[in-house]
């Protein structure tokens, strides 16, 4: 998940309030009656929130706290696409190989539509409470517990994204260096060891960037990252028509009657021990919810309807891009595809593959500090330590980077990152949190019975996802060797 300018930092959004919606004066179900300039709602408990939804809010010119957005609809679509797009795209071909084309298409379509619905719920909750910060929204509805839960889910999601990015560095940088040195892929030395390289990159490049007080130009690297992923998609499609299907040598995992036709024939529905990773990987690839409200707050002439249009366009574009990457990656390597699709391409004597590999490496290295800023800012905000302190800033940064590096070094495969984060934080952010917030906010609204039923079913789906996927992922770990890619 590549964030829109890291989202905005939480401290920058504290004073943002929700603007007048398209039908704010016509839909009697959207807001409770205004009496003496104050909303009668149990969620409006402090002065800041009361001001955001009172008569003074309805009169934009008199509201000092209202900050009009300046971002066009097109640029907002681009920003949200940046927030959606991330390393998850590299694991989709692996997900397709372990589900089959038809089942994968059903899962991808379902998660796309459900993600759009969850954003709709999130926008309704933001409108009803006047909160434009995800943690603040959780605190308004569920108190301190809600704030901590949302902080935990967003931080785990961002940490998972950072882990996947550094895992790309660990996987891809050695191959790029070997190519530039003119060495074979089998060449071995400490300076082409991915574990050593990821530590060098982290503390030589990423740490200095993370120590900066402000994001600065780093907030705009997501555009470069999205461009790199589009370039990657183009290369994947092009290489499909260049790379022949290769039958692996017979071994203990491949029966003696394997044929070229069997190996190079696409499967439409399939089930195996790795099928469980498909849905978490797809969910991981579509999470952008922490960035939705910051993007909404900067949308010009913003309204719920307009932001919903932004999300619809963005998700449709990402759906097309994800499906094309998955299908062409799968049709290139079939059952031999890995959980990191880029790693399957050999850069030996191939400048194009080297170029896309280097582009992706640079993109993820520059994106890690953006995500890191979000996690650290949320941590300081939660601890009420918003005033800058150089010593604390440095110590927390170093500790977090050390922990992240240890995880990257010892995690055997990207599918493990997608699996864990997908069934936990991605599930929370897409299914459980938006539906829970909506059900709580509309608890006493008898006019929204049908919508509440759908939200309750959505919540149940998220809980079922967790109850089924988490045990299956753990079971696969118990039954598989740490280096098994499932082939």
Swiss-Prot record:
Topological domain ranges for the Cytoplasmic compartment: 1-74, 134-147, 212-216, 297-312, 372-393, 438-452
InterPro entries, per database record: AA_transpt_TM (IPR013057)
Transmembrane feature ranges: 75-97, 113-133, 148-168, 189-211, 217-237, 276-296, 313-333, 351-371, 394-414, 417-437, 453-473
Record's keyword annotation contains Ribonucleoprotein: no
Glycosylation site positions: 251, 257
Tissue: Expressed in the cerebral cortex by pyramidal and GABAergic neurons, astrocytes and other non-neuronal cells (at protein level). Expressed in placenta, heart, lung, skeletal muscle, spleen, stomach and testis. Highly expressed in cytotrophoblast cells from term placenta.
Residues with the Phosphoserine modification: 6, 25, 28, 49, 52, 56
Disulphide-bonded residues: 245-264
Residue ranges, Extracellular side: 98-112, 169-188, 238-275, 334-350, 415-416, 474-487
Subcellular location: Cell membrane
Activity modulation notes: Inhibited by alpha-(methylamino)isobutyric acid (MeAIB). Inhibited by lithium, potassium, choline ions, N-methylglucamine. The pH dependence has an allosteric effect on the transport.
A single MF term (Gene Ontology): neutral L-amino acid transmembrane transporter activity
Modified residues (Phosphothreonine): 11, 54
Subcellular location, principal: membrane
Pfam families: Aa_trans
UniProt topology in membrane: Multi-pass membrane protein
Swiss-Prot/TrEMBL GO biological process terms: amino acid import; amino acid transmembrane transport; amino acid transport; female pregnancy; gamma-aminobutyric acid biosynthetic process; glutamine transport; L-alpha-amino acid transmembrane transport; L-glutamine import across plasma membrane
GO cellular component, one term: plasma membrane
Keywords: Amino-acid transport, Cell membrane, Disulfide bond, Glycoprotein, Ion transport, Membrane, Phosphoprotein, Sodium, Sodium transport, Symport, Transmembrane, Transmembrane helix, Transport
Induction / repression: Down-regulated by bacterial lipopolysaccharides (LPS) in glial cells. Down-regulated upon hypoxia.
Annotated function: Symporter that cotransports short-chain neutral amino acids and sodium ions from the extraccellular to the intracellular side of the cell membrane. The transport is elctrogenic, pH dependent and driven by the Na(+) electrochemical gradient. Participates in the astroglia-derived glutamine transport into GABAergic interneurons for neurotransmitter GABA de novo synthesis. May also contributes to amino acid transport in placental trophoblasts. Also regulates synaptic plasticity.
Entry's family note: Belongs to the amino acid/polyamine transporter 2 family.
Protein name: Sodium-coupled neutral amino acid symporter 1
UniProt gene name: SLC38A1
């Amino acid at each position: 998940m590549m964030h829109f300018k890291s989202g905005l930092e939480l401290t920058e959004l504290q004073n943002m309030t929700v603007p007048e919606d398209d039908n704010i004066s016509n839909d009697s179900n959207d807001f409770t009656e205004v009496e003496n300039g104050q909303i009668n709602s149990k969620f409006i408990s402090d002065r800041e929130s009361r001001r955001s939804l009172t008569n003074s809010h309805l009169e934009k010119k008199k509201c000092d706290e209202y900050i009009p957005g300046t971002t066009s609809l097109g640029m907002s679509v681009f920003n949200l696409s940046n927030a959606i797009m991330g390393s998850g795209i590299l694991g989709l071909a692996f997900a397709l190989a372990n589900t089959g084309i038809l089942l994968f298409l059903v899962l991808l379509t379902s998660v796309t539509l459900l993600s759009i619905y969850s954003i709709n719920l999130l926008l309704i909750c933001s409108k009803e409470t006047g909160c434009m910060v995800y943690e603040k929204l959780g605190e308004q509805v569920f108190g301190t517990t809600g704030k901590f839960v949302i902080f935990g889910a967003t931080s785990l999601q961002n940490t998972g994204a950072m882990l996947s990015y550094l895992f790309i560095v660990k996987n891809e940088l050695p191959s790029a260096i070997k190519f530039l040195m003119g060495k074979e892929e089998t060449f071995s030395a400490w300076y082409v060891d991915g574990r050593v390289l990821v530590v060098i990159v982290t503390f030589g490049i990423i740490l200095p960037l993370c120590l900066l007080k402000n994001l600065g130009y780093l907030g705009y690297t997501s555009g470069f990252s999205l461009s790199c992923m589009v370039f990657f998609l183009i290369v994947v499609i092009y290489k499909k028509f260049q790379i022949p299907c290769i039958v692996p040598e017979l071994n203990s995992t491949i029966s003696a009657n394997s044929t070229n036709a069997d190996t190079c024939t696409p499967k439409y529905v399939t089930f195996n021990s790795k099928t469980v990773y498909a849905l978490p990987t797809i969910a991981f690839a579509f999470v952008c919810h922490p960035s939705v409200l910051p993007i909404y707050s900067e949308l010009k002439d913003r309204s719920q309807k307009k932001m919903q249009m932004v999300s619809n366009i963005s998700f449709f574009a990402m759906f097309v891009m994800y499906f094309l990457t998955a299908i062409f990656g799968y049709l290139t390597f079939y059952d031999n595809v890995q959980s990191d699709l880029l790693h399957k391409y050999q850069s030996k004597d191939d400048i194009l593959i080297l170029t896309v590999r280097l582009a992706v490496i640079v993109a993820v290295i520059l994106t890690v500090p953006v995500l890191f800023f979000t996690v650290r800012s949320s941590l300081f905000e939660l601890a009420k330590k918003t005033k800058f302190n150089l010593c604390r800033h440095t110590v927390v940064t170093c500790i977090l980077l050390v922990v992240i590096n240890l995880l990257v070094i010892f995690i055997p495969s990207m599918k493990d990152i997608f699996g864990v984060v997908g069934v936990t934080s991605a599930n929370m952010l897409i299914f459980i949190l938006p539906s829970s917030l909506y059900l709580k906010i509309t608890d006493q609204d008898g006019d929204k019975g049908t919508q509440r039923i759908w939200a309750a079913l959505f919540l149940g789906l998220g809980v079922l996802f967790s109850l089924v996927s988490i045990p299956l992922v753990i079971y696969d770990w118990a039954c598989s060797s740490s280096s098994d890619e499932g082939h």
